[in-house]
């Protein structure tokens, strides 16, 4: 539910701005969103004993030196008691900024460490295939095969040993 509300705020932040100002706003909101990782900060923001104005002033102190539009945006969120949406707004704004810049981040899931040359070759091939700038990170887990997940593009490509075995067995049984 918070994601849906955050998307509307992100759309409002993006409308009528150039990519440079959107990038500046995104960086400032990422600073604020990182503060939400602290438990004490969350308790301050969610506390009913602390006034909304004090909460807004605290958050604005993180983003001092920006234009008035970001300050007014944070004040609006404070008036509507939606300051807890800031991490979701920052995340969605990063996704929209990546789409605008045609720059995406993906994850390669494997059960063993792959060399950086292999990861970069996968990056280059997928970048050429989808005509985007792509950076891949690796996640070593218990997945028996290899899976590439590019979230912003909605692409998930996987090769599983178990699936290959079952398809091979099915093919042999059909041939007999």
Curated annotation (Swiss-Prot):
Coiled-coil stretches noted in the UniProt entry, renumbered to this chain: none
GO cellular component, one term: proton-transporting ATP synthase complex
Compartments it resides in: Cell inner membrane
GO molecular function, one term: proton-transporting ATP synthase activity, rotational mechanism
Keywords noted in UniProt: ATP synthesis, Cell inner membrane, Cell membrane, CF(1), Hydrogen ion transport, Ion transport, Membrane, Transport
Membrane topology value: Peripheral membrane protein
Cross-referenced InterPro entries: ATP_synth_OSCP/delta_N_sf, ATPase_OSCP/dsu
Subunit-level organization: F-type ATPases have 2 components, F(1) - the catalytic core - and F(0) - the membrane proton channel. F(1) has five subunits: alpha(3), beta(3), gamma(1), delta(1), epsilon(1). F(0) has three main subunits: a(1), b(2) and c(10-14). The alpha and beta chains form an alternating ring which encloses part of the gamma chain. F(1) is attached to F(0) by a central stalk formed by the gamma and epsilon chains, while a peripheral stalk is formed by the delta and b chains.
NCBIfam families: ATP_synt_delta, PRK08474.1
Protein family (similarity comment): Belongs to the ATPase delta chain family.
Function: F(1)F(0) ATP synthase produces ATP from ADP in the presence of a proton or sodium gradient. F-type ATPases consist of two structural domains, F(1) containing the extramembraneous catalytic core and F(0) containing the membrane proton channel, linked together by a central stalk and a peripheral stalk. During catalysis, ATP synthesis in the catalytic domain of F(1) is coupled via a rotary mechanism of the central stalk subunits to proton translocation. This protein is part of the stalk that links CF(0) to CF(1). It either transmits conformational changes from CF(0) to CF(1) or is implicated in proton conduction.
Protein name: ATP synthase subunit delta
Species name: Aliarcobacter butzleri (strain RM4018)
Annotated gene: atpH
């Amino acid at each position: 539910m918070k994601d849906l509300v955050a998307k509307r705020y992100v759309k409002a932040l993006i409308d009528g701005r150039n990519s440079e100002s959107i990038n500046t706003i995104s960086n400032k909101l990422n600073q604020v969103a990182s503060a939400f990782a602290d438990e004490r900060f969350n308790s301050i923001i969610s506390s009913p004993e602390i006034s909304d104005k004090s909460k807004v002033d605290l958050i604005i102190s993180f983003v001092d030196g920006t234009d008035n539009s970001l300050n007014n945006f944070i004040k609006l969120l404070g008036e509507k008691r939606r300051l807890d949406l800031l991490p979701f707004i920052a995340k969605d704004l990063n996704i929209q900024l990546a789409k605008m810049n045609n720059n995406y981040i993906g994850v390669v899931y494997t059960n063993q460490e792959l060399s950086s040359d292999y990861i970069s070759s996968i990056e280059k091939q997928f970048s050429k295939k989808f005509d985007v700038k792509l950076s891949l990170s690796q996640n070593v887990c218990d997945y028996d095969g290899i899976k590439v997940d590019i979230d912003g593009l909605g692409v998930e490509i996987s090769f599983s040993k178990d699936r290959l075995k079952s398809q091979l067995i099915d093919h042999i049984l059909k041939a007999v």
